[in-house]
């Protein structure tokens, strides 16, 4: 059996997954692109701060009023949150979890992370909760939902 069919498409065993989970994979790409964008924003503001900068060190006196602080926190918050989500999405794809559910959860997470990012850049407040907290919470609840529902799916498949 050839892996290239007569329409010049590559046929790889299990490649149906890529079609079935295309929306999920695109959502993951958006999430990872958002995080890369956040890294570039944080680098730009960090290197542009007055008084110079030291690689990887944020001045301890900086707070919410500093875009250097907020861009750094936005990026690190995304890094903290992507690890469990990304792992669960990969497990979902490999275990043939519902493609439509996984796509919906991934896009909810992607959109809430983008809104959270924009609000974190724009809102200068020490108050908690703030409007950005709502979108952090939606992303966190999305993680919890996927953790529980995927766990049930994996247990049922035993």
Feature map (PLM): residue ranges:
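Interfacial loop-to-transmembrane junctions
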Residues: 115-142
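Short alpha-helical packing/oligomerization segments
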Residues: 91-111
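Membrane interfacial helix-start motif at the N-side
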Residues: 17, 61-83
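Short, strongly hydrophobic alpha-helical membrane anchors
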Residues: 1-21, 157
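Alpha-helical transmembrane segments of multipass membrane proteins
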Residues: 34-42, 84, 112, 116, ...
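Core segments of transmembrane alpha-helices
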Residues: 34, 76-91
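N-terminal signal-anchor transmembrane alpha helix
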Residues: 18-58
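Juxtamembrane boundary at the C-terminal end of a transmembrane helix
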Residues: 147-158
């Amino acid at each position: 059996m050839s892996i290239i069919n007569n329409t010049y498409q590559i046929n790889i065993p299990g490649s149906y997954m890529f079609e079935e989970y295309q929306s999920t994979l695109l959502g993951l790409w958006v999430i990872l692109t958002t995080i890369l964008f956040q890294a570039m924003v944080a680098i730009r503001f960090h290197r542009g701060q007055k008084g110079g900068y030291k690689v990887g060190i944020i001045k301890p006196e900086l707070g919410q009023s500093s875009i250097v602080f907020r861009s750094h926190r936005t990026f690190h918050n995304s890094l903290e949150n992507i690890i469990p989500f990304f792992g669960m999405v990969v497990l979902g794809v490999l275990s043939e979890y519902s493609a439509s559910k996984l796509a919906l959860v991934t896009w909810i997470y992607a959109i809430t992370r983008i809104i959270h990012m924009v609000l974190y850049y724009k809102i200068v407040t020490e108050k908690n909760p703030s409007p950005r907290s709502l979108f952090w919470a939606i992303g966190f609840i999305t993680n919890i939902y996927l953790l529980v529902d995927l766990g049930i799916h994996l247990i049922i498949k035993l």
